[in-house]
Structures are given as C-alpha cells and as structure tokens.
Amino acid sequence: MPKYVFGPVPSRRLGRSLGIDLIPPKTCTLECRYCQLNTTTELLCQPREFGSTEEILKELNTTLDDIAKPDWITLSGAGEPTLSRSIGEVIRRVKQLHLAPVCVITNGTLLHLPEVRKALFPADRVIPTLCTVFPETFQKIHRPAPGVDLCNLLKGLSLFASHFQGVLEVEIFVIPGINDTPREVAGLSRYLAALPRLAAVYLNTAVRPPSDPTIRAATAQELDNMKNGLALVVPVTTVLDHQPTSKRVIRKHQATPEGVLALLLRHPCTIEQLSQVLDTPVTSLEP
C-alpha cells in the first residue's frame, strides 16, 4: 500500500488534488470531534522526523508517471502535516518539479513556531482551520494535545499571514449550537477582519459522518446565517456553494486495491467519486 501519496481526490476547492501524507495515520495535535477519520491515536505538540524526503519524492514520481497532471499537489491526510520536520523540504522539492501548485491544509496549531512558518512560506496556497477565538470552545471542539493552546494558534496565524506571499484561505468548520452563536461569530469576525492578506473564508460542515455522532451538519440556512454574520470584505463561501470536481482522473494503469485503500483511509469518497478517481464506470464498483 502506498505509504505517503494518495489520490488524486475530487476536491470541492482544488479540483483533482494529489495528496501527500507526511506522517503516520491519526497522528495529530488535536482530537477534533468533527473529524471524519475516527479518533486520534497519537497526540503530539511538537514536530518530529517521520519519513524520508527521498522516499516521499520517489513515491510521488511513481504516481505522477501513471496519471494526468493534477490541478494541485496537497499536503494533508489523516493527521497534521506540520508535525513533520521535513515539510519545508518536501514543499521545495515538489515545487522544483514544476508540475502543479502546492497547497497545505493545516489545523494551524504549530504556526507559532518560526520554523513551521518558514517551512510553509514557499507553498502556493495554505488553508488553516479556525473554528473559534474562545479557549473554552476550542477545548470543547478540538480536545488538543497537552501544550497546544488557542492563544498560540491565533498569534501564529497572524504572524504567518503577515509574511506569507501565497493564497491564504481560512476554513471554519461550523458546528451548530457550538461555534455559530452570535458571540462566536462576532469573535471570529473581529479576528478575521484584522488578519493580514486573507484571501477568502470557507465554511465547512459535517458532509461526511464525524467521529462524534452528536455532531450534526449545519443546514444551508445556518451556513448562510454565519456567512452573513461574519460580514467580511473578503469572499466567504460555504461547502454547499462548491461541488466536487467532475474531472476524471486519467490513468495509464488500473489502480491497485492497495492504492484505493490508501485513498479511503485519508479521504472517504462516494462511489461516484471513486469512479472518477479510478477512471472506471460506477457499475463496475457496485456490489
């Protein structure tokens, strides 16, 4: 089974996104109640060495030889990518291939570390998550590792935004009744309005089953209410404004069962999305 590279996956915002997962599954700084990938097995608060950059690049090149050019190469997966000390080197090496722009999807909890901010600067796009500006709500939603706190996240994100030259888009995961109250929305609005170089805000919600069954998806009306309540100058869109790309992934060879499993472990898909990813008819995937 591929150890690092998965997809391409049909992304709502990134089209055909080829993923690179730098760390072992479910290694994270948070144990978010809304996570679609079950519970975190190892909670960490500092970056570590996990994998060989050469091994990652070798696996990436093998995958790229088999597929048409992806729209994005995205560092994400089943945990927090900035926990990998090699993330900066991987970004630089991938960009040297000149195949696709590089995006990093992060929970933002390590952006207070200068070495993490510096590592992400070469990326073309960074999408950090920010669900609240209140510590008690942060604890309730994210259940962080010891040593991870909201104050560092807020300071780190502001510092990163002040110097990052790429596209910065903040994602808010909306949990009805928890972070969409007037107080919560007003707090997020104040912080985001002051965030330098912010390009856009994206409101997500539980479109796939979360690890905590008490978390429900926000309705279209609830998402619109939060969108209007933020009252930001930058564009604010919701998960319902975007549809997964309809572009098929053209492959030279049939995807292996191991490759499919590697994808599903990191990015749960519908059968229609799998059909696109595998370049095979839906009927051949039905039981």
Residue ranges and their predicted role:
Residues 83-226:
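Conserved AdoMet/S-adenosylmethionine-binding subsite of the radical SAM
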Residues 74-80, 107-108:
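Glycine-rich beta-strand-to-loop/alpha-helix junction loops that act as flexible
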Residues 38-75, 89:
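Conserved alpha-helical substructure of the radical SAM core
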Residues 12-55:
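Canonical Radical SAM [4Fe-4S] cluster-binding loop centered on the CxxxCxxC motif
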Residues 35-40, 69-72, 133-137, 167-169:
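Short, basic/glycine-rich phosphate-binding loops at helix/coil junctions
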Residues 70, 123-124, 234:
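Short, well-ordered alpha-helix to beta-strand connector turns
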Residues 25, 42, 80-81, 177-178:
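Short strand->helix junction
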Residues 1-13, 57-58, 65, 183-287:
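Auxiliary Fe-S-binding modules of radical SAM enzymes
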